Amino acid sequence: MSVRSLRWPRQKAFLAVISLVVAVLLAVPGWLTPATAASQATVQFVAPTWAAERLNNKQLKILDVRTNPLAYIEGHLPGAVNIADAAYRGPNGFLPVQIWDPEKLASLFGRAGVSNNDTVLVYSDGNDVLGATLVAYLLERSGVQNIAVLDGGYKGYKDAGLPVTKEYPRYQAARFAPKDNRAFRVDIKQVEQLTGKSTFVDPRPPALFSGEQQVFIRNGHIPGARNIPWPTFTEANNANESLKNPHKLKPLSELKAILEAKGVTPDKDVIVTCSTGREASLQYLVLKHLLKYPKVRIYEGSWTEYSASNLPVETGPDRV
């Protein structure tokens, strides 16, 4: 028997092993693997002076996402276009308040004068910062690279004595190419597979998290989730009345301590979930873009979708 004939069975066996390994890797669903690819986008929380210094920059587009149009009419940042955060969501044939498809999101951004290559500043006002953080998340999801959230919101900007106006800006609609980066989020099938493996953060009020407050089809939370109500990330409950502001973030050192006390550390695969995906957007942005946690995703369907499924529900306060 020749040397060549001896090698051939070994080569066949080696190739068979390689083929088996490749087949196994291809068979593992990609969504079971934590998202480790860094976003190309930059999301900042910027001071009012940052915004005021850039009002004449034509590459800066400003979105006022306040829900009440009269609030915008009464006064807004110069150049700001009002499109309420509620406009970005609606029914999907089964669930309410779901994010529109990429084409509709692109149309909304384009009508507001935003293109994919612009720097976009988002701000809101009122009881929470969540409208601004939701739209900032949607801009990132849609492929915008440079995004800023106005830290302190419209109130903080106005209180700083910076310029506001009642004039409506004249602008042209822009071309916004639809994009959709699925690496930033998980769906309900992924949630089912990742429960008990990933770290779920739920920023809803404790009464909703525990199931005490009966709002949904089923009430409670995803088993093992950590309850970190979103206002704890802001100055919403500052003991000094003059400093209370649900649009103003606490120092990053305090945010990091809040997370670490709940066992939410940078080595974890973190999924943020809430009622409708809106509350989750704040902690998603803070963890990913400010604290630089490498593996953070958002469950957009959140409890609206989960409560309508037959997946397990846990009640009571979290165990951490």
From Swiss-Prot:
Source organism per UniProt: Synechococcus elongatus (strain ATCC 33912 / PCC 7942 / FACHB-805)
Keywords: Periplasm, Repeat, Signal, Stress response, Transferase
Active-site residue numbers: C274 (cysteine persulfide intermediate)
Catalytic function, reaction form: thiosulfate + hydrogen cyanide = thiocyanate + sulfite + 2 H(+)
Gene expressing this chain: rhdA
Leader sequence segment: 1-37
Domain notes: Contains two rhodanese domains with different primary structures but with near identical secondary structure conformations suggesting a common evolutionary origin. Only the C-terminal rhodanese domain contains the catalytic cysteine residue.
The protein's Enzyme Commission number: 2.8.1.1
Chief place where the protein resides: periplasm
Coiled coil: none
Induction per the UniProt record: By sulfur deprivation.
Broad class of enzyme this protein falls into: transferase
Domain Rhodanese: 56-166, 194-315
Name by which UniProt lists this protein: Putative thiosulfate sulfurtransferase
Function: May be a sulfotransferase involved in the transport of sulfate. Displays very low rhodanese activity.
Sample GO molecular function, one term: thiosulfate-cyanide sulfurtransferase activity
Localization (cell): Periplasm
Xref: Pfam families: Rhodanese
One GO term describing the cellular component: periplasmic space
PANTHER family from the UniProt entry: THIOSULFATE SULFURTRANSFERASE
